[in-house]
Amino acid sequence: MSNLVLKNCKTIDNKIVNIIIENGIIKDIKKTILPSEKETDTICDIKENIIIPGLIDTHVHLRDPGMTQKETWTTGTQAAAHGGYTTIIDMPNTLPATDTKKAFQEKRNIATKKSYVDFGLHAGVKTRQDVMDIMSEKPASYKIFMDLYTNKQLDEMFNYVSQTNKPLSLHCEDKTLVDYNIKTMKKNPLNKNKTITYSYARSALAELIAVNRAIEFAKKYKLQLHLCHISTRQTLELIHEAKEKLNISIEATPHHIFLDNTTYERYGVKAKTNPPLRDSNYNITIDNLNEFDSIGTDHAPHTIEEKEKDTWKSAAGIPGLETALKLLLTEVNNKRLTLEQLVKLTSTNPANIFNIPNKGKIKKGYDADITVINMKETGKISIENTYTKAKYTPFENRDYVGSNIMTINRGNIISQDNDVYKYDSKYIY
């Protein structure tokens, strides 16, 4: 691996530095470049654009294996590199689900060949033996979709994971209430083409009940919880009370931060997601971000055909890898978010929560994962010229100010000027 010097980098505290990269690792951070380094290394002039640690997305659905019509490890990680991400962690709900050692190994082999960024895998929860067997493969966490299981099943699954010392990532919606609401609302044929009805079926109360149950199980089994895509202010209040005594981290998604259920009027079923977009009585906004520990895109791509069905049959999910950073940098320019907060939420904290070694900081000895941003670049978000297979976004035509212009993964430039480049990716554990 050739060495690289990043010249004239502006840090988030407005210092101009040069970063010396050797064998994919940050060797040094200096104010000047030594003559020997000028002669032997590749020099890349950053031109006083701002550098931040490469973004880490701990919540993506790359659909590979089994659903490659939606996304693949190639297209999904190209989208990640293009969006400023250097590390992603994939969710287990592929076909087959990543809930056995064999399925875990098969997915990792696919990712190793195809991925444009470094990666980890969350494991599903099946039997106790499967949970124990997967431990040798070093999963980032175990993941449970609470809306798919009964209380008895959840109790057993929490128990299994408690024996691993791994985090438990949770999708928090109450199965009984969601099933009842959907069954009731389906009886009215007028609801078939009203996407907003879906948000009432998967109600704020369903999230609150599930989170409360998760907290009680965490007390019982002494687990580290990572609560994915929390979507209501009321749930946040409950979690913060519990955080005083329990090890809990909270994730926000860009679509829950920047959208509400009025989006359904403009965008219909293409904005359908789980949990759904909330109304103003419940929804979180950029002003609530200081209450969260991390931002995950919940990048959940589908085909246009799968999205353009009626309210109940349309696939739920929104792509986010190529829009998230633009949305967040716009809020930095709007003075509603600081770069320090952005770095914590998208890099430092995700690395800490999931114990990812040598990532999340621009620091001597760490992986040279760096995202270069131009805070003055302007434009409109468009699905054109994106790498994801999911050719839709509820942020279409939204103005942005600030964008990533280069992504560097372990000293390799993997994205620049809207192009992406492949180098050897690695499993992060």
UniProtKB/Swiss-Prot annotation:
Catalyzed reaction equations: (S)-dihydroorotate + H2O = N-carbamoyl-L-aspartate + H(+)
One GO BP annotation of this record: purine nucleobase catabolic process
Involved pathway(s): Pyrimidine metabolism; UMP biosynthesis via de novo pathway; (S)-dihydroorotate from bicarbonate: step 3/3
Residues binding Zn(2+) 2: 143, 171, 229
Keywords: Hydrolase, Metal-binding, Pyrimidine biosynthesis, Zinc
Residue list for modification N6-carboxylysine: 143
Binding site for Zn(2+) 1: 59, 61, 143, 298
Residues annotated to bind substrate: 61-63, 93, 302, 316-317
SUPFAM superfamilies, sorted: Composite domain of metallo-dependent hydrolases, Metallo-dependent hydrolases
Keyword Transmembrane assigned: no
Enzyme Commission number(s): 3.5.2.3
Entry's Gene Ontology molecular function annotations: allantoinase activity; dihydroorotase activity; zinc ion binding
Protein name: Dihydroorotase
Organism: Methanosphaera stadtmanae (strain ATCC 43021 / DSM 3091 / JCM 11832 / MCB-3)
